[in-house]
Amino acid sequence: MTDEEKKEYCWNHAQIVEGYDKDSIRKDACGAWIFKAHYGMRDSVFGWEVDHVFPVILGGDDFTKNLRAMQWKNNVSKGDDYPEYMSAIQSEGNKNIEKEASYTVNDSLQQELSEYYNK
């Protein structure tokens, strides 16, 4: 899968928000707003990156179920943590704010990744 294909896959699986243009605005797994055009832009509060749910350092790869769009500060905050991780950015209304929260990868995805990676 090319980098562009990974980007498109992740965007297409990010959370669609009713009332917003799904082709340009979505939310990440932590509920932070992301703008499609801001991919890779760490100078934007709406910038985002491709996250590996099961980190590469632990043996993860570009298996599609292991990829998702994540606001860049949330991706940095998550780092190599799995299955529990911390976010740094949350949405409040139609804006992003700095706010930490704890998340756990859902059980069904953990099971699927465990089977795929034989962990």
Give the positions of each predicted feature:
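Polybasic, low-complexity binding patches
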Residues: 60-65, 76-119
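Flexible domain-boundary/linker segments
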Residues: 27, 70, 84-88
